[in-house]
């Protein structure tokens, strides 16, 4: 296959850096966020005012991290740096100043790839989308159907303030959802006179009713207003004027307690047309009066006042890593401040130093808690490079300060017109999180206020101006402009050709002449996310299936020999490169050395730059991370050139699947209901073989009876089983292991109680005994096998940090090659997924006129009802490309080149392919895109021509090997005594309500009885049954299921008198000790149950 790819459509396909949203935010935190927090807490004074502690925020410094990234992963450590800050302790009485550099905690650092290493695991901090602080005007209908209006002032932190109108034209205010207070009471309490308020309002006549109402309640002075305010906000406490004054001051005018944030101030200024500087982060009298004025204008419907849409992206902002971390640091500093104040009061004033006052623990704990257990700090999805990249660009509405799944309604989840070019309308999970977790669109970026912006080209007098950088607009700015889509047709000069252009204006569509267009979108791809933009012919797919296609590409397992798609979209290179999976040259220069582990590039000044490659490392999802060089010694390279392929990459492009020959036809029912029929070639040629690396870990702990030991001497184990263990009892690297094999031998001391009487007798006679130990080795779990690729041992002597109580930890990595097999899940890029139902020999597969057998047979009925026709276009375009020996890049949304363009392009390529010598059969004009296939079993041609072509098919991470599971005996749940569920718990198969109905319908009474008793939760019965099976005796009669006893107990605990009786009215005690039954001979199950049996028992 030639490496040159033909670009079918010419548009801007180069994207901005895709991980910028993470990196820029963390950089902001280091440059500004941290300093801002330290400064806001400085100075801390003690209760007497004698001592002051100043943090010199802009003089903080970070030490070099103790371990580099690789070392941190290996040692299970955190990749973090120590923070030091200069502190000044000022004694006001003596004027003495002590200055010292103090350690204030560890700060995890971001790696180049935008991730964090926490305890050896790579984690990502997901961006959160929350309601922006500011002022919001809403309308509500009361129960009589009358509209009332309200205004909420929402700060970044602090109390909410809500103004409301009611049916009597009075204005009220609520603080933090407490009881209503007359709005004028608040004005008076703030020290505003009636005239102050009236002068500021454009329609004061509406407000006068509220003044009269306040006077009628007898609140005419500031003091009375403050008392009233205190009564309403703190009911049940004795009110006082000073209390009211302090309450008002701390709630709204104290920067420590109330903060609008830079964003809140910007939004309020913009909405109310104020000019308050953005350093004033608390409420001002002007804010409150302007809000009232705007609310009255809304009520009277004058002055251009408008309601707010809270789902508009102009009213929602993104909090990225930097800001989330800053909030967490604030929490830590708050705790620290309390500690410092206490220490100032307790300690000797003269001998105190800053180092004695500052305790790093609270800050360390806050940061650790955020990275370790916050909802937004997630274990990185590393299945393949695309999964990793998407995870870093994810935007979640959940998390602290956000929404919860249960409370989120339809409006929040829905696609909003302002999402255009900012959030992807397609990529979101299926299920309860749909619409709450989104993905950033390809060209979107987050501005300094946290609003998402998207780029446009300017249009002047109908001419597109593409000089310089594009202009980025946020959602509220864009609403005021007329924006044309990115696929408008222009001439070479940039003049727009059509007479009327569809534009978006104020969230609506209209058609205008080119002269009225303000901006044009940068590229047709800018609407969708990275994963979605990898789907070719996306415009021909139904949105639901495109959603599945986007999500399933993230689950594709990296294959042994990746192959880039025949039909791509032109973004594959950038996705591979920005995911951080491929090493990139840092300089212009020449490759001087290449081997499997490193590449050395010598720059123009003769300096060597070494790039180390990852070899067979385990990813978070147990897939294999491996890099292979693609440059040779002596090659010239430029900055930013890809030097090696990572997992699921080929030639620097992302390659998630394989291009295989697909036919759409039914085959003996083997592809019924989305099942897939595949050829043996995929197994034999290792097309879909992937490497998975599993980690097994064991620790030797200190027990009460002495330490556990990792050793080769394991009791009651044959010498053959120890063949692959070294003298320490640890498996050698390169050994092939199967389920049940010992990986690490470990023995645990046995207590006296564990010993049978004969052991005790022997010990009494001979004194020292055969070692009292129990085999506790690490073995390969059932259904697993593979080759040991790495063994790591951690001990205290080597300086490794171990969990408490552990003396030594051993880790074994086992790699396995998994070929494709029946039960594995495969999918295309268009949401067409299925399970492999049969693997046919090559000779039985349908074959083409030139004798080539097809690789995969899909069901044609999967296309029409699902409306993902893109797969057919891809398949035919791939067929043409394979026959022309080239690769094609198709940019989505190609109607700008004319109607039905996809169809024409594909047909043109097919005709071109058929012109090749000996390839006339490739295109049949009577049945375009279809070929006559021949049945491999009979050699007869099929009745109808069949659609055949090359499509990229992925193997997904849902592998049957990880799911298959069986149980003979195993653990039971404590309360119900029923078997546990799931593979991890060695669980059973649930026999649910409907399965019971099915057996009842058949009348299979004995089968049903066994399933509900001895095979499940009849404790005594199942022990007896096992005993009977082992001894070859008939199985005894089942007893009472434990769950029935639990039900009885529950009903009794409700106070109901409920019991079980024989048909003679004699009560049966279900809870009595069940031992007497043991003495009776075990009866066959089929014996009829007589009354006499009870008397025997």
Swiss-Prot record:
InterPro entries: DNA-dir_RNA_pol_bsu_ext_1_sf (IPR042107), DNA-dir_RNA_pol_bsu_external_1 (IPR019462), DNA-dir_RNA_pol_su2 (IPR015712), DNA-dir_RNAP_su2_dom (IPR007120), DNA-dir_RNAP_su2_hyb_sf (IPR037033), RNA_pol_bsu_bac (IPR010243), RNA_pol_bsu_CS (IPR007121), RNA_pol_bsu_protrusion (IPR007644). It is an enzyme of class 2 (transferase). One of its GO terms (biological process) is DNA-templated transcription. Gene3D superfamilies: 2.40.50.100, 2.40.50.150, 3.90.1100.10, DNA-directed RNA polymerase, beta subunit, external 1 domain, DNA-directed RNA polymerase, subunit 2, domain 6, RNA polymerase alpha subunit dimerisation domain, RNA polymerase Rpb2, domain 2. GO terms for molecular function: DNA binding; DNA-directed RNA polymerase activity; ribonucleoside binding. Its EC number is 2.7.7.6. Residues 1072-1097 are annotated as: Disordered. It catalyses: RNA(n) + a ribonucleoside 5'-triphosphate = RNA(n+1) + diphosphate. Keywords: DNA-directed RNA polymerase, Nucleotidyltransferase, Transcription, Transferase. It comes from the Bacteria. GO terms for cellular component: DNA-directed RNA polymerase complex. PROSITE patterns: RNA_POL_BETA (PS01166). DNA-dependent RNA polymerase catalyzes the transcription of DNA into RNA using the four ribonucleoside triphosphates as substrates. Belongs to the RNA polymerase beta chain family. In cyanobacteria the RNAP catalytic core is composed of 2 alpha, 1 beta, 1 beta', 1 gamma and 1 omega subunit. When a sigma factor is associated with the core the holoenzyme is formed, which can initiate transcription. This is DNA-directed RNA polymerase subunit beta. It comes from Prochlorococcus marinus (strain MIT 9313).
């Amino acid at each position: 296959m030639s490496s040159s790819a033909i670009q079918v459509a010419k548009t801007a396909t180069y994207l901005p850096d895709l991980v910028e949203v993470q990196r820029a935010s963390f950089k902001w935190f280091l440059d500004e966020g941290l300093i801002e927090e330290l400064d806001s807490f400085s100075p801390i004074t003690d209760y007497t005012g004698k001592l002051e502690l100043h943090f010199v925020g802009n003089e903080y410094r970070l030490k070099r991290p103790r371990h580099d990234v690789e070392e941190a992963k290996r040692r299970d450590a955190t990749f973090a740096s120590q923070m030091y800050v200069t502190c000044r302790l000022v004694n006001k009485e003596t004027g003495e100043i002590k200055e010292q550099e103090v350690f204030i905690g560890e700060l995890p650092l971001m790696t180049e790839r935008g991730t964090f290493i926490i305890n050896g695991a790579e984690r990502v901090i997901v961006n959160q989308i929350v309601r922006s602080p500011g002022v919001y005007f809403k309308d509500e209908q009361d129960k009589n159907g009358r509209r009332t209006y309200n205004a909420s002032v929402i700060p970044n932190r602090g109390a909410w303030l809500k103004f409301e109108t009611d049916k009597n034209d009075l204005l009220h205010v609520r603080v933090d959802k407490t009881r209503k207070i007359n709005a004028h009471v608040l004005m008076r309490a703030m020290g505003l006179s009636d005239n102050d308020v009236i002068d500021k309002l454009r329609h004061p006549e509406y407000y006068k009713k509220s003044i009269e109402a306040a006077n009628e309640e007898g609140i005419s002075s500031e003091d009375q207003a403050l008392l009233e305010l205190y009564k309403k906000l703190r009911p049940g406490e004795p009110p006082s004027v000073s209390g009211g004054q302090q309450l008002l001051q701390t709630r709204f005018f104290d920067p420590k307690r109330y903060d609008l944030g830079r964003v809140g101030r910007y939004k309020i200024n913009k909405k109310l047309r104020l000019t308050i500087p953005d350093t004033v982060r608390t409420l001002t009298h002007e804010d409150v009066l302007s809000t009232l004025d705007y609310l009255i204008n809304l009520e009277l419907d004058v002055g251009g006042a408008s309601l707010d849409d809270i789902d508009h992206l102009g009213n929602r902002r993104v909090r990225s890593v930097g800001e989330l971390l800053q909030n967490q640091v604030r929490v830590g500093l708050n705790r620290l401040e309390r500690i410092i104040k206490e220490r100032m009061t307790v300690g000797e004033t003269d001998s105190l130093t800053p180092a004695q006052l500052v305790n790093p623990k609270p800050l360390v704990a806050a940061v650790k808690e955020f990275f370790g257990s916050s909802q937004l700090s997630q274990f990185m999805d590393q299945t393949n490079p695309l999964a990793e990249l998407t995870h870093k660009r994810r935007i979640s509405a959940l998390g602290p300060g956000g929404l919860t799944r249960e409370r989120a309604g339809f409006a929040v989840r829905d696609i909003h017109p302002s999402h255009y070019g900012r959030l992807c309308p397609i990529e979101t999970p299926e299920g309860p999180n749909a619409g709450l977790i989104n993905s950033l669109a390809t060209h979107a970026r987050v501005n300094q206020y946290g609003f998402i912006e998207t780029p446009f080209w300017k249009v002047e007098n109908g001419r597109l101006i593409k000089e310089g950088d594009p202009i980025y607009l946020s959602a509220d700015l864009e609403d005021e402009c007329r924006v044309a889509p990115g696929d408008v047709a222009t001439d070479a000069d940039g003049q727009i050709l059509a007479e009327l252009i569809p534009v978006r204006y104020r969230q609506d569509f209209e058609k205008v002449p080119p002269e009225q267009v303000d901006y044009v979108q940068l590229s047709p791809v800018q609407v969708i996310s990275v994963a979605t933009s990898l789907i070719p012919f996306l415009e021909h797919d139904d949105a639901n299936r495109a959603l599945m296609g986007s999500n399933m590409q993230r689950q594709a397992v990296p294959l042994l020999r990746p192959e880039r798609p025949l039909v791509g979209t032109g973004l594959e290179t950038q996705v591979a490169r920005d995911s951080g999976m491929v090493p990139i040259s840092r300089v212009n220069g020449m490759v001087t050395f290449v081997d499997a582990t490193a590449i050395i590039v010598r720059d123009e000044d003769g300096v060597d730059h070494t790039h180390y490659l990852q070899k067979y490392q385990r990813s978070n999802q147990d897939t294999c991370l491996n890099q292979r060089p693609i440059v040779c010694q002596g090659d010239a390279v430029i900055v930013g050139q890809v030097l090696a392929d990572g997992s699921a990459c080929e030639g620097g492009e992302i390659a998630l699947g394989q291009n295989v020959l697909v036919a759409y036809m039914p085959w003996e029912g083997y592809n019924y209901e989305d099942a897939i029929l595949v050829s043996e070639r995929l197994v034999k040629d290792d097309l879909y073989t992937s490497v998975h690396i599993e980690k097994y870990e064991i620790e030797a702990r200190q027990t009460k009876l002495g330490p556990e030991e990792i050793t080769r001497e394991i009791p009651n184990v044959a010498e053959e089983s120890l063949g692959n263990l070294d003298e320490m009892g640890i498996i050698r690297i390169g050994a092939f292991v199967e389920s049940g094999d010992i990986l690490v031998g470990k023995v645990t001391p046995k207590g006296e109680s564990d010993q049978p009487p004969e052991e005790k007798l022997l010990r009494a006679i001979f004194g020292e005994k055969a070692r009292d130990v129990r085999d506790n080795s690490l073995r390969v779990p059932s259904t697993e096998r593979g080759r040991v690729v790495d063994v790591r041992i951690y001990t205290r002597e080597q300086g490794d940090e171990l969990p408490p109580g552990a003396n030594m930890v051993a880790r074994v990595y086992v790699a396995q090659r998994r070929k494709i097999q029946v039960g594995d899940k495969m999918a295309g890029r268009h949401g067409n997924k299925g399970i492999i139902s049969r693997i046919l020999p090559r000779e039985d597969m349908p074959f083409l006129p030139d004798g080539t057998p097809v690789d995969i047979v899909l069901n044609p009925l999967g296309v029409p009802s699902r409306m993902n026709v893109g797969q057919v276009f891809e398949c035919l375009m791939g067929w043409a490309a394979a026959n022309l020996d080239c690769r094609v890049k198709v940019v989505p949304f190609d109607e700008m080149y004319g109607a039905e363009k996809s169809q024409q392009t594909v047909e043109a390529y097919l005709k071109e392919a058929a012109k090749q010598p000996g390839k006339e059969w490739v295109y049949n004009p009577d049945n375009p895109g279809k070929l006559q296939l021949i049945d491999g079993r009979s050699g007869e041609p099929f009745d109808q021509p069949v659609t055949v072509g090359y499509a990229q098919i992925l193997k997904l991470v849902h592998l049957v090997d990880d799911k298959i599971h069986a149980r003979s005996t195993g653990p039971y749940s404590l309360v119900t005594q029923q078997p546990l569920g799931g593979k991890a718990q060695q669980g059973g198969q649930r026999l649910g309500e409907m399965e019971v109905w099915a057996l009842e319908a058949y009348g299979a009474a004995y089968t049903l009885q066994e399933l509900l008793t001895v095979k499940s939760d009849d404790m005594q019965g199942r022990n007896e049954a096992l005993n009977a099976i082992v001894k070859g005796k008939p199985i005894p009669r089942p007893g009472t299921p434990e769950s029935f006893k639990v039900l009885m107990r529950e009903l009794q605990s409700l106070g109901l008198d409920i019991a079980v009786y024989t048909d003679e009215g004699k009560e049966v005690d279900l809870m009595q000790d069940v031992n007497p039954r043991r003495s009776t001979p075990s009866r066959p199950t089929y014996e009829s149950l007589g009354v006499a049996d009870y008397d025997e028992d």
